[in-house]
């Protein structure tokens, strides 16, 4: 079933007396369990699209359903709830809180979800062990390498069992070898059933994912997606359902 | 968000910038310290005054004093006999709302025994004197109506007199012994209890002996005489009370310039039977005295109530002005907190963005910042209270015993509450600013 459904989304920014359409009529469906990427040059609208999908912002017009909930006109508090319970973020710059140790960084989303301290601790430990950092539990981010930081960020993103994880250039600040291990981690997560959306401008990454959505000038490029998704080597072992309705008619 | 979590974050934030946080708190610390010291000082003064008031007979006691008659009666003023025993008789007979009338004639006189002479105020009065002034007997008996009627030469003395007239044996209770008042021998029939203020009692119990006190006074360049004004019980302990009839016979019969007896009282006090009828009582007494004074309004009332009100209002005034100054200090401290919190959230815009991205609501961010500044207020308040305790200790050493500052629980709570309140209020604007940051902008920041 469709986890995310976008219908004719527009996002218009007012800059001075000019209106700039960052997204200009985007329709898209993402199914549960998909592992896909959004690719495009800077200024193509991919970040804006991710912000909308990630409930950090609301569209100017069009409808946006996430897990069956229409968030296109949601209030700030509703969006916060959505982000907290259904969405996980992984950023290029990791964005861990430098004063908290690994454990507390990972616990943080559950604090805002109102999970009790005991359960929080258990689930955080499980998530940290899942990204192989059980031995770094009480280190602060400053004592960790970039790859380790990103793994902590992933643990934080998945600790609330979100429906979908957004990764914005997750390998952008890492060397290629470390980036590879992070991608492998995402792949493992995808295999275990998590829906993952990677936003990148790196074709190397994009070409290895089961599905790619290419953005250009605020629109999804017609045809590219379907072609790529068929030729791309399937890195994910289980077959990914493809609907191919995302492109604009 | 969990309040405790916010508290922990706040403490960590303060711990991460110890010096900066301390400087921020300094305003609050000074504000609270000055507020509490001021409360303690005025409370000390108030206690001292209330103690003095209670010692002098409380608000029920009213004194009839001399007053300039009003202008149109000034030419007739000679008609009035002034305050005399006639007033006492008239009041005892007619003033139903008064339950005690006490006349007093007094004058400083040499009090001697053998070759030792004291110069003290001898008082000619009635038995009611002891009741009105709340003077209790330690040994012997008080003056009785019989003494008045029979014009006995008897005297009741304060507890410090024996020690000063019999210095060779301070514990001697000289009941039945004779002392001379202006050369006239009087027999001691009673010795009053020793009176001391609570402060003096505390001091004595803390082990400050007279010798120590004398040394201390010598060090401070004060003689015992100078210290008198600080002891409201000095007069009680140096009481020389004789029957007014005897006093009149011995000292007043030819004391006017023309050789006539001086019948005037030096003091006339009465006690209001029911404090609820205070004003009615004064009216009644006024109308009776109008008759005995032949319509000349040459008397007025000195009520302790007025005195009490004056004390209270002057304390209130001191308290208000002190609070204002301390309040300004607290306000400055609050502005300091606001300033630092604003700097702190600018430093942490990205952190706020991250918190928002992982699901913190605006409200959560708001609470976090307010809790942080509240914690500064709480810690500043606690340090301020400690500082005030130190300041008060110093003041206790410096100030006169009766007015030693006192820290009361409510003063502590008020000062502390102010500190916390200022901390929280100063955090409101930064918290609002932080909570309205756009998460996308905040994530991009820096």
Q: Where do the language-model regions lie?
A:
Chain A
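ABC-family P-loop ATPase nucleotide-binding domain
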Residues: 1-12, 222-249
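H-loop (His-switch) and adjacent beta-strand-loop-beta switch element
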Residues: 212-225
């Amino acid at each position: 079933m469709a986890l995310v459904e976008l219908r004719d989304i527009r996002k218009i920014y007012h800059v001075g007396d000019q209106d700039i359409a960052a997204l200009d009529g985007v329709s898209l469906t993402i199914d549960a369990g998909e592992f896909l990427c959004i690719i495009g040059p800077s200024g193509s609208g991919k970040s804006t699209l991710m912000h909308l999908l990630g409930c950090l912002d609301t569209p100017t017009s069009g409808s946006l359903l996430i897990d069956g909930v229409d968030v296109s006109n949601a209030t700030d508090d509703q969006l916060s709830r959505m982000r907290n319970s259904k969405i996980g973020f992984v950023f290029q710059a990791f964005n861990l809180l430098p004063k908290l140790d690994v454990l507390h960084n990972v616990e943080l989303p559950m604090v805002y979800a109102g999970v009790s301290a005991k359960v929080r601790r258990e689930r955080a430990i499980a998530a940290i062990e899942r990204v192989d950092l059980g031995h770094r539990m009480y280190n602060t981010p400053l004592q960790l390498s970039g790859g380790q930081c990103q793994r902590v960020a992933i643990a934080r993103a998945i600790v609330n069992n979100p429906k979908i994880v957004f990764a914005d250039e997750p390998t952008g600040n890492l060397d290629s070898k470390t980036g590879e291990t992070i991608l492998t981690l995402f792949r493992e997560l995808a295999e275990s059933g998590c829906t993952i959306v990677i936003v990148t401008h790196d074709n190397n990454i994009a070409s290895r994912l089961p599905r790619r959505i290419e953005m250009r000038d605020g629109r999804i490029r017609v045809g590219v997606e379907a072609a790529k998704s068929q030729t791309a080597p399937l890195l994910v072992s289980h077959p990914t359902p493809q609907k191919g309705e995302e492109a604009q008619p | 968000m969990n309040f405790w979590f916010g508290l922990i974050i706040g403490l960590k934030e303060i711990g991460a910038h110890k010096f900066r946080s301390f400087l921020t708190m300094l305003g609050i610390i000074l504000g609270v310290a000055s507020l509490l010291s001021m409360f303690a000082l005025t409370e000390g003064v108030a206690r001292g005054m209330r103690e003095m008031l209670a010692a002098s007979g409380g608000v029920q006691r009213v004194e009839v004093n001399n007053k300039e008659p009003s202008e149109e009666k000034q030419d007739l003023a000679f008609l009035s006999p002034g305050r005399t025993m006639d007033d006492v008789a008239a009041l005892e007979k007619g003033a139903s709302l008064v339950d005690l009338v006490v006349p007093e004639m007094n004058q400083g006189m040499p009090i001697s025994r053998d070759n030792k002479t004291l110069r003290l105020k001898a008082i000619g009065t009635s038995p009611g004197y002891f009741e009105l002034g709340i003077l209790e007997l330690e040994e012997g008996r008080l003056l009785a109506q019989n003494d008045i009627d029979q014009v006995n030469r008897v005297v009741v003395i304060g507890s410090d007199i024996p020690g000063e007239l019999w210095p060779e044996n301070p514990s001697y209770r000289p009941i039945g012994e004779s002392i001379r008042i202006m050369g006239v021998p009087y027999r001691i029939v009673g010795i009053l209890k020793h009176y001391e203020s609570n402060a003096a009692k505390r001091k004595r119990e803390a082990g400050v002996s007279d010798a120590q006190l004398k040394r201390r006074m010598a060090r401070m360049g004060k003689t015992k005489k100078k210290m008198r004004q600080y002891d409201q019980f000095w007069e009680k302990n140096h009481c020389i009370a004789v029957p007014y009839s005897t006093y009149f016979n011995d000292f007043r019969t030819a004391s006017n310039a023309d050789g006539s007896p001086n019948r005037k009282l030096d003091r006339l006090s009465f006690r209001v039977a029911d404090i609820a009828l205070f004003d009615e009582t004064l009216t009644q007494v006024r109308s009776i005295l109008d008759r005995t004074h032949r319509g000349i309004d040459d008397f007025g009332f000195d009520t302790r109530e007025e005195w009490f009100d004056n004390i209270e209002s002057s304390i209130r005034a001191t308290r208000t002005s002190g609070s204002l100054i301390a309040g300004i200090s607290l306000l400055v401290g609050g502005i300091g907190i606001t300033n630092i919190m604003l700097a702190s959230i600018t430093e942490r815009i990205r952190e706020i963005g991250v918190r928002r991205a992982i699901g913190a609501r605006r409200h959560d961010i708001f609470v976090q910042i307010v809790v942080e500044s509240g914690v500064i207020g709480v810690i500043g308040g606690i340090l301020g209270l400690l500082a005030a305790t130190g300041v008060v200790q110093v003041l206790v050493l410096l100030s006169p015993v009766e007015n030693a500052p006192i820290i009361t629980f409510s003063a502590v709570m008020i000062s502390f509450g102010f500190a916390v309140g200022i901390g929280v209020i100063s955090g409101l604007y930064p918290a609002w600013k932080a909570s309205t940051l756009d998460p996308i902008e905040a994530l991009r920041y820096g």
